[in-house]
């Protein structure tokens, strides 16, 4: 058999090593002992790490979920969160709780989730997040559908929470939504801003909308509600006073959007809304974020915390990239209002 240069090199290297072993000095016993100890320490460390990984892989985590109210955006956030953990192969038991829009119920549920010894709690919407954060400073809390966690006193800063809270923000492209309004309704003169005065996120977005409307030279009026029972009356009071309604990602309005749409559409008042679920419920249009992806992002944060040892105190609040915002128009509503949307496609 013909021997290649590479094979010859290997053989010569083996012979040389053997000759050096036979003719060289005897190994230093102390050095040998040190090498053995180092090898044993390394082996022990690797075994400990492997055991830890095996334990984490085999563990079933308890996760409590507190959702403020049932409506499409928050439901999708919840679904995305659960999907991310399942996709990562993390074994979880979810304790799903819904406060049905009752902030006092949020407090009761928050206490229960903490006392049940959950490994992590996922809070959807600001009141739910504030309730849980007020009960524990040790259990990791991930939040979502919260516009500005820092402004809501949930974290020290959105860049560095410095506490047991992090998560994802649903800050919407308010300016772009006002731009969309102008594109669809170029003759709009006065806008009615509809939101719940008790929701900090809604107040923040309303202020952002006012800035955008001021820049555009469009007048506006505030129309606020403090309970769902007021929605129909407040929307009816807009008739004859506004050309268009703008409502941000407001949980109370989202849950009652069918009522808003019923009154607004009957009176030929277009509604530009904060998210897709509100369009499905009868709103005219939005340029908004994908709440499923928002929840999925929070789920990925949970995976990092539970299985990778990520420190929630240094985990910045996550934001969806603007490129993931999507235009959605309710064609049936546009037809009912007699609005041409062909230019949007």
Predicted regions and their residues:
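Bacterial lipoprotein signal-peptidase II cleavage site
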Residues: 21-33
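Hydrophobic alpha-helical segments within soluble ligand-binding/sensing domains
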Residues: 56-58, 149-190, 290-310
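Extracytoplasmic "Venus flytrap"
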Residues: 58-82, 88, 95-105, 198-202, ...
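An alpha-beta-alpha
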Residues: 63, 81, 167-213, 311, ...
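Structural motif
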Residues: 93-115, 224-238
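Beta-alpha junction/loop-to-helix N-cap segments that form part of ligand/metal-binding clefts
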Residues: 98-156, 250-274
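Pocket-lining segment of extracytoplasmic ligand-binding domains
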Residues: 200-269, 275
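Flexible loop/turn connectors
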Residues: 278-329
